[in-house]
């Protein structure tokens, strides 16, 4: 076939595009994905995962971290292997071979061609910086074209150990490298896009050889052909800059970024440079999105060598789910300032995380992050940091802005899942064998003169000075453990464990006192760690924070010790089966505004035909908002062009009304609609609360969620209790502990709109004719700015003149019935005990049937009444739901129809239970106090006992009567409180 002579170098299954390399003409071909090519791509990904070492060379491995794998919780790679990356492998999941640590010496023979280019002629001496920089330049800047040509020829002829031809025939030479025994490698959630390690080098080589990146599409194929070498010519101004610069022109790759990438937006900035979102294009064909970091270097070669430390650290790391994946780097001119000159900049191409960073997410949530999310994030960070430590790298700047949130599609669960990724390796350092094996005298000769990282996340030993004013400690793995503990504390409580740190989410907080903060951190001790009372966190979470924030470094655990604990093993197993998913919100102010929607979930849905193939009008219509006071709360009705803030639309349907198997009374089934669908959005104006909203069309099966409030009262009561919302739990069982997740995802809860109005739940149904003019109000966040909050259904409350607690409104299905049964069963047992206690004063006596059986029957009658009432209510409710569905209207629970039947049933149950309780008390009083004891108690020996003292006839029955009276009061309280 024609494709046999091509080498597959890139495959993006989401975009259904592939890039092939022609070794004869040294050109690149862009083609649509086919079934055969897609199958070959999967084989290449599989081959790449088997042969690639998941840790760097043994010389860079940290000696303090054991290299033996740790089996976590008995998790095997065959049980949901691709669902969550926290599965730790003790055996290769593909070739079924056990790990052999003795084969680690063969890793150097099986590394990729990219690393061969970068590390060609490299020296084993880690202190020889010049040799390392030259080796990096050999790989990155291609100053040695002969070496690159030879390496490319090896790739074409099959010399690369990690390549396979288009027919799937392996061209691997030598012995396949064993699966790396690192316990920190985690299998990917879904099949990642295949990108050859030589792809960007081949692209760069083809660019230098004169590839013309024009639109030459023929039969859905886009071929880059050789052209004249006009593209390599540089303007005279840039030639003068090259001559005056400290960098030779051969180090610069002029026009590479503009030719193959299209810059969209700026997504972040830091001390080293800025990060931009870009799209990789060949002949106008979109091949995916990446993040590129531009670091100005100018003529400062020492600064370039320092920045290259990040590149060196990234290139030694292979693909890991919790680490930002490095792609390529090169030198090129750029203009960092708007009115400044063009200077040489180092471009670092990396993987793009599509859901912002942890700092923005924590600023939105504050201290409301559920513990299930905290533990999932913590496990992700442990695996990422553990992989860095195992690879001989310490990050030295673990903080929320450097932790990115990424969402990927999980083909196993058919939904998106969320995980964290560690980024920004500009301050990282390597842990070489010379540093660990060097004698103490050698270590003392290397003195630390400053600090690297953020003060709030620095370990105390790094700020402690000796008598001579010099720092005592150096950076090691335990510094990252401390930063992880501070990060875990901040996720749990929304603040830092320091007095002078101020608000971590405010850049220039006046309460932040830097000199006092440094002294506080340097003098930190174990007994100074204080946990706030609100929010309440579990003891396990507090214990983990306490262990991580030990003042002495040797008392802190290693990552391998943390992951080997039984508690973390159980958590890892849980999140392997049930990975979390965060709603995709607009918390990232640098959100991608491109018309191309290439997220994995969108592509999968597009293939299924459940959504439209284009959604460019959504982002274009979001710019038509006319006032900044419009809130982000939205409701879904019909298509419109007035989209506000491009937020998620929410709808509520009654198609499944009355089909709840858990006997919930008129449960309203909530559903979620993709934001891609065109929906009409109601504009909420926080300044004018007297605007009127259009009436709800009774012929539609949708309820417009509207936030109501009283103009004279700013109190708004919202039900945030997941345990009291059965409709929400039935729709999303995987996020039952995530209250804020459900609030943002569009599930209906409920609202109180008046000072004297009672609360109605999400299972309540509002009559369309009960209210025509409703006032609206925007719920603002804790910072005072209008945030993205949920629109709640408007329900008109009855004028009862009595305000009840929001969570106690109606009796609901199985849960209420179970509570009644448990209570009355305990009451019956207590009644039996009272009868035996009544007869305990006489020896060899027991309660007579005239005393015991009637009381036991009266105690069990309420159970039968409750079950009968629930069954009748459910039958009437189902009939009423059928009438509602046939008419296409929704009736209020407190109005006519099923709501009235339920309320009448509750009132009847209350009356019956009250009457039965009073009858039981009177009967016990008559039998035990007014009648002789010989009637209420019966002797086992049939011998008339000797009469006891008068105290047993008077005092003891009165005590028993008091106990029964207490039981009556508890019963009445339960009846009126529950009903």
UniProtKB/Swiss-Prot annotation:
EC assignment: 2.7.11.1
Location of the Protein kinase domain: 261-568
Annotated stretches, region: Disordered: 207-245, 593-666, 713-793
Mode of membrane association: Multi-pass membrane protein
A Pfam entry, by short name: Pkinase
Mitochondrion as UniProt keyword: no
Polar residues bias locations: 593-602
Binding, ATP: 267-275, 293
Molecular function via GO: ATP binding; protein serine kinase activity; protein serine/threonine kinase activity
Main location: membrane
Catalytic activity: L-seryl-[protein] + ATP = O-phospho-L-seryl-[protein] + ADP + H(+); L-threonyl-[protein] + ATP = O-phospho-L-threonyl-[protein] + ADP + H(+)
Gene Ontology CC annotations of this record: membrane
Nucleotide-binding keyword on record: yes
Glycan attachment positions: 32, 110, 120-121, 147, 155, 161, 220, 231, 243, 592, 597, 615, 645-646, 663, 699, 731, 734, 870, 894
Biased composition, class Low complexity, residue ranges: 212-244, 610-666, 728-737, 753-773
Record's keyword terms, sorted: ATP-binding, Glycoprotein, Kinase, Membrane, Nucleotide-binding, Serine/threonine-protein kinase, Transferase, Transmembrane, Transmembrane helix
Position of the signal peptide: none
Biased composition (Acidic residues): 713-727
Protein family (similarity comment): Belongs to the protein kinase superfamily. Ser/Thr protein kinase family.
Protein name, per record: Probable serine/threonine-protein kinase iksA
Organism this protein belongs to: Dictyostelium discoideum (Social amoeba)
């Amino acid at each position: 076939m024609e494709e046999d002579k091509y080498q597959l170098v890139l495959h993006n299954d989401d975009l259904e595009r592939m890039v092939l390399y022609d070794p004869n003409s040294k050109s690149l071909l862009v083609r649509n994905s086919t079934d055969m090519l897609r199958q070959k791509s999967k084989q290449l990904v599989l081959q790449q995962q088997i042969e690639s070492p998941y840790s760097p060379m043994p010389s860079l491995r940290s000696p303090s971290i054991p290299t033996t794998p740790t089996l976590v919780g008995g998790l095997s790679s065959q049980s949901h292997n691709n669902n969550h990356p926290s599965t730790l492998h003790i055996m290769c999941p593909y070739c079924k071979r056990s790990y052999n640590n003795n084969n680690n010496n063969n890793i150097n023979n099986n590394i990729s061609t990219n690393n061969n280019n970068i590390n060609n002629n490299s020296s084993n001496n880690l202190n020889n910086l010049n040799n390392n920089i030259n080796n990096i330049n050999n790989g990155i800047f291609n100053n040695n074209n002969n070496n690159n040509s030879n390496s490319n020829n090896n790739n074409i002829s099959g010399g690369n150990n990690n390549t396979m031809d288009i027919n799937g025939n392996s061209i691997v030479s030598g012995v396949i490298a064993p699966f790396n025994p690192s316990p920190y490698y985690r299998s990917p959630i879904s099949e990642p896009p295949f990108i050859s390690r030589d792809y960007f080098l081949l692209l760069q080589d083809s660019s230098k050889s004169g590839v013309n990146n024009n639109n030459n599409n023929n039969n859905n194929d886009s071929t880059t052909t050789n052209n004249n070498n006009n593209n390599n010519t540089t303007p005279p101004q840039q030639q003068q800059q090259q001559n005056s610069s400290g960098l030779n022109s051969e180090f610069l790759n002029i026009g590479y970024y503009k030719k193959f990438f299209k810059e969209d937006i700026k997504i972040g900035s830091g001390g080293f440079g800025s990060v931009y979102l870009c799209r990789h294009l060949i002949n106008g064909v979109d091949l995916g999105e990446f993040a590129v970091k531009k670091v100005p270097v100018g003529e400062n070669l020492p600064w370039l060598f320092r920045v290259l430390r990040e590149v060196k650290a990234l290139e030694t790391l292979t693909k890991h789910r919790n680490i930002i994946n490095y792609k390529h780097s090169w030198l090129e001119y750029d203009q960092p300032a708007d009115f400044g000159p063009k200077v040489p900049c180092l471009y670092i191409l990396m993987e793009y995380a599509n859901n912002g960073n942890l700092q923005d997410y924590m600023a939105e949530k504050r201290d409301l992050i559920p513990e299930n999310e905290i533990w999932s994030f913590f496990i992700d960070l442990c695996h990422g940091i553990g992989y860095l430590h195992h690879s001989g790298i310490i990050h030295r700047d673990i903080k929320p802005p450097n932790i990115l949130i990424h969402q990927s599609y999980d083909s196993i669960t058919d939904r998106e899942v969320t995980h964290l990724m560690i980024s920004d390796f500009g301050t990282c350092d390597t842990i070489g064998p010379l540093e660990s094996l060097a004698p103490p005298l050698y270590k003392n000769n290397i003195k630390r003169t400053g600090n690297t990282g953020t003060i709030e996340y620095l370990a105390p030993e790094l700020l402690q000075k000796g008598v001579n004013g010099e720092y005592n400690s150096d950076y090691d793995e335990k510094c990252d453990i401390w930063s992880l503990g501070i990060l875990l504390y901040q996720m749990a409580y929304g603040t830092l464990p320091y007095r002078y740190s101020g608000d971590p989410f405010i850049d220039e907080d006046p309460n932040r006192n830097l000199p006092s903060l440094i002294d506080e951190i340097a003098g930190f001790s174990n007994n100074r760690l204080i946990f706030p009372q609100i929010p309440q966190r579990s003891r396990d979470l507090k214990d983990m924070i306490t262990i991580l924030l030990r003042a002495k470094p040797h008392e802190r655990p290693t990552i391998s010790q943390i992951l080997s604990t039984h508690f973390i093993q159980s958590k890892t197993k849980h999140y392997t089966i049930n990975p979390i998913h965060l709603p995709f919100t607009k918390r990232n102010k640098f959100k991608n505004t491109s018309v191309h929607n290439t997220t994995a979930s969108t592509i999968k849905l597009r293939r299924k035909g459940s959504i439209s193939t284009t959604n460019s009008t959504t982002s274009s219509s979001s710019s038509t908002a006319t006032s900044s006071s419009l809130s982000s709360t939205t409701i879904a009705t019909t298509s419109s062009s007035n989209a506000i803030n491009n937020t998620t639309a929410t709808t509520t349907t009654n198609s499944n009304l009355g089909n709840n198997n858990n006997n919930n009374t008129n449960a309203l089934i909530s559903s979620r609609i993709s934001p891609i669908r065109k929906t009409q959005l109601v504009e909420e104006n926080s300044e004018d609360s007297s605007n009127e909203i259009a009436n709800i069309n009774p012929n539609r099966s949708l309820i417009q969620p509207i936030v109501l409030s009283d103009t004279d009262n700013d109190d708004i009561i919202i039900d945030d209790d997941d345990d009291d919302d059965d409709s929400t739990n039935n729709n999303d069982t995987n996020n039952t502990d995530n209250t804020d997740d459900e609030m943002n995802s569009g599930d209906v809860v409920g609202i109180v709109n008046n000072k004297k109005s009672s609360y109605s739940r999400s299972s309540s149904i509002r009559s369309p004719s009960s209210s025509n003019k409703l006032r609206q109000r925007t719920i603002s966040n804790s910072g005072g700015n209008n945030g993205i909050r949920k629109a709640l259904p408007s329900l008109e409350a009855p004028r009862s003149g009595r305000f009840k607690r929001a969570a106690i409104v109606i009796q609901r299905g199985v849960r209420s019935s179970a509570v009644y049964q448990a209570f009355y069963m305990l009451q019956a047992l207590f009644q039996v005990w009272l009868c035996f206690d009544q007869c305990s004063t006489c020896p060899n006596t027991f309660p007579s049937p005239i005393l015991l059986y009637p009381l036991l029957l009266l105690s069990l009658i309420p159970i039968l009444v409750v079950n009968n009432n629930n069954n009748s209510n459910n039958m009437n409710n189902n009939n009423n739901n059928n009438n509602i569905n046939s008419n296409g209207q929704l009736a209020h629970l407190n109005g006519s129809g099923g709501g009235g039947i339920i309320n009448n049933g509750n009132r009847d149950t209350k009356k019956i239970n009250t009457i039965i309780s009073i009858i039981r008390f009177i009967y016990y009083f008559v039998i035990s106090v007014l009648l002789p004891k010989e009637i209420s108690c019966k002797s086992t020996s049939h011998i008339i006992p000797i009469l006891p003292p008068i105290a047993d006839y008077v005092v003891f029955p009165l005590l028993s009567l008091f106990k029964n009276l207490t039981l009556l009061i508890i019963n009445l309280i339960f009846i009126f409180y529950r009903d």
